[in-house]
Amino acid sequence: MRVVGILPARLSSTRLPRKPILAETGKTLIQHTWEVASQATSLDAVIVAADCDELADAVNSFGGHVELTGEHLSGTDRIAEVVERCCPDAEIIVNIQGDEPEIDPAHIDAAVSALESHPDWQMTTLVTPLTDPELLASPNVVKAVCAEDGRALYFSRSVVPFSRDESVEKVLKSGNSPWRHHIGLYAYRREFLLKLTQLPPSPLEQLEKLEQLRALENGATIGVVEVSESAPGIDTPEDYQQFVARWREANG
């Protein structure tokens, strides 16, 4: 089964302009992420889906595989263009965020393995236990509600499931949190990904601004894999400086 990882990337980030090619460590951010993703043993290829020539040149400079795409509303649409044009023999496509240079390659492998093991699932994603009340309350932290058999039931920016009888603090103190933090890594079956990106935005997707709800609202099964922790994303200048500090500490 051929599996391809694709990193959607663009220079026009509003909170952190030119994010993929920031290079205070001596390597661009997109190179860090590409190199880590390439360590996933499940992937036969890793491709960067770039939005402009400057970014494509940066990827070519370190020997990465890059495909230039047109303008798109989402990273998923950007990936679909690359898949349709360049990956005719791929069976599974993994959407890897281009701004997560500390992602664990084993997490990529776990998402792929779960999809390979469940032929009735159309896609898989990751979650991690959510135990911090501040993160739980934040609309920027997406919560996942999961069934016992590993299927996703819903994703929301609200606190779901809702605890009617006990406070959030009391539930968390019990040491058995029912809440899960959704991690935005996805493994798709190729044909399902192409079909999904042709569907119009769904009502709940538009309400929550969560693209994965389009799949649920159209009857797809999303499998969920729980991992112990999530890699910090880089969305702001502060996030990037913290990454640089961690990298320098780890690399002397």
Where do the language-model regions lie?
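Conserved core of the sugar-phosphate nucleotidyltransferase
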Residues: 103-202
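Short, high-confidence coil segments that cap the C-terminus of an alpha-helix
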Residues: 43, 88-90, 119-121, 220
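A general structural signal for well-ordered alpha-helical segments in protein cores
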Residues: 56, 75-79, 108, 152, ...
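N-terminal glycine-rich phosphate-binding loop and ensuing alpha1 helix
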Residues: 2-49
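Short phosphate-binding loop-to-helix
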Residues: 47, 53-113
